[in-house]
A protein has these predicted regions:
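Acidic, Mg2+-coordinating active-site environments of NTP-dependent enzymes
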Residues: 47-51, 58, 64-74, 78-97, ...
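Switch II of P-loop NTPase G domains
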Residues: 169-176
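Residues in the short beta-alpha loop(s) of Rossmann-like NAD(P)-binding domains
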Residues: 40-42, 144, 219-220
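Walker A (P-loop) phosphate-binding motif
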Residues: 9-14, 98-146, 245
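ATP-dependent carboxylate-amine ligase
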Residues: 1-56, 68, 72, 88-93, ...
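Short beta-strand "acidic-cap" motif of Rossmann-like dinucleotide-binding folds
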Residues: 35-40, 139-141, 162, 234
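Switch II (G3) loop of P-loop NTPases
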Residues: 159-168
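Conserved motor-coupling elements within RecA-like helicase/translocase cores
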Residues: 154-157
Length: 258
């Protein structure tokens, strides 16, 4: 896997920029100071938002859309026969998958990676809001918009970068997590792991071993199995949690606890 250097300004073209995931990446790359262009098969709210932000986004795929790009990033849905991908290969412009560009972004900050079968977006959103309220000015790429901020992608001046770690394609192993958070571990996306749950658990072990700080949900058996293998801080409602939630009260749009 090629991880490009994004410390200097680049001209980056995104194929499939209208999807939520690639749109978030485009947003962050633009805020980092790179010249970002893109294309998608049709107009949509993400395309419109990127245009409003100042990016040139084409509708339809054509070799001419590459312009003077020196780096091309493509979504998982884009085939090698795509005319823009073929043109980039002919011009020897590096073509990266989403799983290549995310580690390059995370390398520019201290990374907090939220991994797990479920709950990544919710946990990442709560963490982002907590850090914003604490004036830590975090950057983040989250799988959904944070309502209070109006975006799921922010590049700010603080030292921390929050990102969801996807185990479905092993991307979480290359994000350079300084702090690793695991919400739960269940047998999912096993096609990536030869249909072997043990291989999935081994990947999670590799993920947390590389981090300086590990945080696990004490309520999940899979996360606790991981915590026994690689100890860390635990949280949840379970009595054995290091940080335990008690006196839980649920409101219409909120949950409070001690």
């Amino acid at each position: 896997m090629m991880i490009p250097d994004l410390s200097e300004a680049r001209r980056i073209h995104l194929v499939g920029a209208g999807g939520a995931g690639m749109g978030a990446i485009a947003d962050v790359l633009h805020r980092m100071g790179h010249t970002v262009t893109g294309s998608d098969l049709k107009d949509g709210p993400v395309v419109e938002r990127l245009r409003v932000a100042g990016m040139e986004i084409h509708v339809g795929h054509d070799a001419a859309n590459l312009g003077s790009a020196d780096l091309v990033a493509i979504s998982t849905a884009i085939p090698e026969r795509n005319p823009e991908v073929r043109a980039a290969n002919e011009r020897q412009i590096p073509v990266l998958r989403r799983s290549d560009i995310l580690p390059a972004i995370s390398a520019e900050r201290r990374s907090i990676v939220v991994a797990g079968t479920h709950g990544k977006t919710t946990t990442s959103s709560m963490l982002a809001m907590a850090m914003v309220e604490a004036d830590l000015d975090p950057s983040f790429i989250i799988g959904g918009d944070v309502n209070e901020i109006g975006s799921g992608a922010v590049w700010a001046d603080g030292e921390w970068f929050i990102i969801e770690g996807d185990e479905s394609d092993r991307t979480f192993l290359s994000l350079g997590a300084e702090i690793a958070i695991v919400t739960n571990v269940e047998p999912d996306h096993l096609e990536t792991y030869d249909n072997d749950p043990e291989q999935l658990m081994e990947a999670f072990v590799e993920f947390v071993e590389a981090a300086t700080t590990r945080i696990y949900c004490a309520d999940d058996p899979g996360a606790m199995q991981l915590a026994r293998a690689v100890p860390g801080i635990t949280y949840g409602t379970a009595e054995h949690a290091d940080y335990r939630m008690v006196d839980i009260e649920t409101g219409r749009a909120s949950v409070t606890f001690t």
